[in-house]
């Protein structure tokens, strides 16, 4: 069970996008690394040649950032927080350490 999963609100804690809040679009676990693709954060521009199906041009795309550079963002309290695990009715669930609110 991962601490940050798709659909979570996260805040970027390091890098040029520090302080930006976004929603995790996709998690990629490959080669022992975990990368998070966050909506509207870490944008880069890509030049695409025209083809039969698509026009060419310069597009902004989201790139993956390392999961160590993001933290869970509690949208109710408006602060970043850590995520922990506990057992509720024999089921392992994620909870916010700052408020104790159960996520799953």
Curated annotation (Swiss-Prot):
Database matches in PROSITE patterns: RIBOSOMAL_L24 (PS01108)
GO molecular function: rRNA binding; structural constituent of ribosome
Signal sequence annotation: none
GO cellular component: ribonucleoprotein complex; ribosome
UniProt keyword rRNA-binding, yes or no: yes
Keyword terms, alphabetized: Ribonucleoprotein, Ribosomal protein, RNA-binding, rRNA-binding
Pfam families the record matches: KOW, ribosomal_L24
GO biological process, one term: translation
InterPro entries from the UniProt entry: KOW, Rib_uL2_dom2, Ribosomal_uL24, Ribosomal_uL24_CS, Ribosomal_uL24_KOW, Translation_prot_SH3-like_sf
Keyword hit for Methyltransferase: no
Residue ranges of the TM segments: none
Family according to the record: Belongs to the universal ribosomal protein uL24 family.
PANTHER family per record: MITOCHONDRIAL RIBOSOMAL PROTEIN L24 (PTHR12903)
Description of how the protein assembles with itself and partners: Part of the 50S ribosomal subunit.
Identification of the protein by name: Large ribosomal subunit protein uL24
The species this protein was found in: Anaplasma phagocytophilum (strain HZ)
């Amino acid at each position: 069970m991962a601490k940050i999963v798709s659909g979570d609100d996260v805040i970027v804690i390091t890098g040029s996008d520090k302080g930006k809040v976004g929603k995790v679009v996709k998690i990629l676990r490959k080669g022992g690394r975990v990368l998070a693709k966050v909506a509207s954060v870490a944008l880069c521009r890509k030049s695409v040649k025209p083809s039969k199906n698509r026009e060419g041009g310069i597009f902004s795309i989201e790139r993956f950032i390392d999961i160590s550079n993001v933290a869970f963002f509690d949208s109710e309290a408006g602060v970043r927080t850590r995520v922990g695990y506990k057992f509720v009715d024999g089921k392992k669930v994620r909870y916010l350490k700052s408020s104790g609110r159960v996520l799953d």
